[in-house]
Amino acid sequence: MKDKAQNIGLRMVQEFASTEALSDKFLIFDNYTSPMEHLGTFAITGHPVKLDSLLIVICSEGYARLIVGFEEITVLENHFLIVMEGKPFEVLELSKNFKAELMCLKESLFELQGSHILRFLHLIRENPCQPVLASKKQEFEVLLKCLKQTMTDTGNKFRQQNLQYYLY
């Protein structure tokens, strides 16, 4: 990796992706309802970046090849990757048919959840790329749809509580 990673804030990602965000703690978007070039020019920067939030990539088609920390990882179809807050990563390659849901969220969103979230985060640090089990794929898709619908419902004053409920 290069000497210095570029720091990117959640607000910068929100503006670039033209998506709705929940304060400075959560946003969700995809790369297939908008042109691929839009995400591609952001994702393949030629240098490592660090986000000020967790990045979750849920690949539904194709693949992406990244370096996370010092480890090269390939996110395949029906896999998800979690990059911890502040960890440097670089996107090396995206397949032409790459489709993914992307979520950025601050660890502070989990403040009220106690020690079981900390155990989960520790597990993810050890194994950042996991398959979406076939038995859970439909459930995963419904959850993502609920998260997206909740984000677009800007008139709902309980939006943050609903998102936290879905994520826990």
Please place each PLM-identified region on the residue numbering:
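A hydrophobic/aromatic-rich effector-binding and dimerization subdomain
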Residues: 2-3, 16-19, 91-153
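A short, compositionally biased micro-patch
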Residues: 59-61, 76, 84, 94
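Short acidic-glycine-tyrosine-enriched beta hairpin
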Residues: 70-82
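All-alpha amphipathic helical-bundle segments outside canonical DNA-binding/catalytic cores
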Residues: 153-166
